[in-house]
Amino acid sequence: LKKHRELDLRNQASTNLFFQEERPDYVVLAAAKVGGIQANRTQMADFIMENMQIECNVLSAAHETKVKKLLFLGSSCLYPKEAEQPVKETAILSGSCEPTNEGFAIAKIAGIRMCEYYHKQYGDNFISCIPANVYGPGDDFDPQTGHVISSLLARMHYAKMNHLPK
């Protein structure tokens, strides 16, 4: 397990070298450029480009080194803005993405499709799942740039620590 500062998955040569040296049997691709609504709104090109770079580099390296199984983590934000609730996986690409995170969503959709295509074309055991919402260590808890859940937790913690009204 490597941190971003140890391995930049946006760099194809570094990614290939890591896979060639480590020869992992199983890969969980959870790495992504992520951010809250404001970051997604102002860095659309960065979100689609960096996430596509990560996905292309990792899937290609996993294929070349014959990884036994790869799990790609999608995102609930890739569903259309007006998807029927409760949302079903078949809703992907059935409508327009939420404009505030469209770049990120399109990259995640591409990652899911790449897993499917590697499986169909080469027989690679690349699968994907779409977790509802996650947070934890290393998440961005800043109310201006973080995701909703982590930002709300940070705001509640701040209010409690500073004895602010509920």
Stretches found by the model and what they are:
Residues 82-91, 116-166:
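NAD(P)-dependent short-chain dehydrogenase/reductase
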Residues 2, 27-33, 70-76, 129-131:
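SDR active-site strand-loop-helix element
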Residues 9-52, 64:
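NAD(P)H-binding glycine-rich loop region in Rossmannoid oxidoreductase-like domains
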Residues 1-7:
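A short beta-strand-loop structural module common to alpha/beta enzyme folds
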Residues 103, 107-110:
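Active-site helix of classical SDR
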Residues 56-101, 127:
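Conserved Rossmann-fold NAD(P)-dependent oxidoreductase catalytic core, especially the SDR/UDP-sugar
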